[in-house]
């Protein structure tokens, strides 16, 4: 059975400290290369404290508020007979203190105890993108959530987990069974990652997009001093100069394109009047007039789109 560490609000100092030196469900998704939110390299820097933990977003806050509704829906439609949902806190594996789980609910067969769960429930809120999720009732939620509940099942020693998702397109439920082979590999990768943390060995970032590496460096250096640095690497200097040149050219091209676009729309507006489309003598469409609906449901002022 897993060992309870405590029950703290998500994002609280105690919650963050419990996760600092341990590997949780979202962490294992990053370590295994399945997370769309962060890489091994980013996770390493967060664990080492070289960048701050991610702040709570509006979407995360919304998920906190809708979680009880999704749990109630799951209880009404999918909770197995003879089981109950229990709120829970932060746990670790009984033999691996570094393996952490923070599930939304435990599924128990004793309404008065959470010590021996039979399953795990993870709740997600997403505003759109139904195509990223499988069909209701299948076993294929997005890979990073699949990895998360696999990790939780391993901590608690249970054989299945459900993922309940609430979105603008309704509710869906995914039933995931424990994958022992994948978990064996995941534990091995997690132990290697922890060793790299302890030894201060930074993961290879050669496959990281430059934009992501830049974002990390910005977070690592939040202050501005009067110091001046000299860059003496010729390749770096050439790349920086080329980037500055391309940036300036793009700005000039964008400004020129905007001038031409405005001039074209001025001409079109006079020709088109209230017409929907403008065409050339051979029938090629040049532009279309459209109108977006306002909050009152009425169409707004028409605008021209160039084809």
Functional labels for PLM-detected ranges:
Residues 1-307:
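Accessory terminal regions of nucleic-acid processing enzymes
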């Amino acid at each position: 059975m897993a060992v309870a560490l405590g029950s703290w609000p998500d994002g609280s100092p105690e919650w963050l400290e419990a996760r600092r030196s341990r590997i949780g469900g979202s962490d294992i998704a990053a370590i295994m290369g399945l997370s769309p939110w962060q890489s091994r390299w980013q996770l390493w820097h967060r664990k080492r404290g070289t960048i701050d933990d991610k702040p709570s977003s509006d979407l995360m806050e919304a998920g906190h508020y809708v979680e009880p509704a999704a749990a109630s829906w799951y209880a009404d439609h999918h909770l197995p007979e003879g089981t109950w949902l229990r709120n829970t806190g932060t746990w670790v594996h009984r033999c691996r203190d570094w393996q952490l789980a923070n599930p939304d609910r435990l599924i128990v067969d004793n309404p008065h105890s959470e010590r021996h769960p039979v399953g795990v429930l993870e709740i997600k809120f997403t505003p759109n993108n139904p195509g990223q999720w499988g069909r209701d009732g299948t076993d294929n939620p997005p890979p990073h959530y699949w990895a998360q509940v696999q990790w939780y099942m391993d901590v608690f020693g249970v054989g299945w987990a459900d993922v309940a998702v609430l979105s603008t397109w309704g509710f869906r439920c995914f039933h995931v069974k424990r994958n022992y082979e994948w978990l064996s590999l995941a534990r091995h990768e997690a132990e290697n990652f922890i060793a790299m943390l302890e030894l201060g060995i930074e993961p290879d970032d050669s496959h990281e997009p430059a934009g992501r590496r830049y974002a990390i460096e910005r977070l690592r250096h939040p202050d501005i001093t009067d110091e001046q640095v000299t860059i003496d690497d010729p390749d770096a200097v050439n790349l920086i100069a080329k980037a500055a040149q391309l940036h300036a050219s793009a700005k000039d091209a964008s400004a020129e394109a905007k001038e031409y676009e405005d001039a074209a729309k001025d001409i079109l507006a006079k020709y088109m009047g209230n017409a929907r489309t403008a065409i050339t003598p051979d029938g090629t469409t040049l532009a279309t007039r459209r109108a977006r609906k306002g909050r009152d449901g009425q169409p707004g002022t028409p605008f021209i789109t160039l084809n």
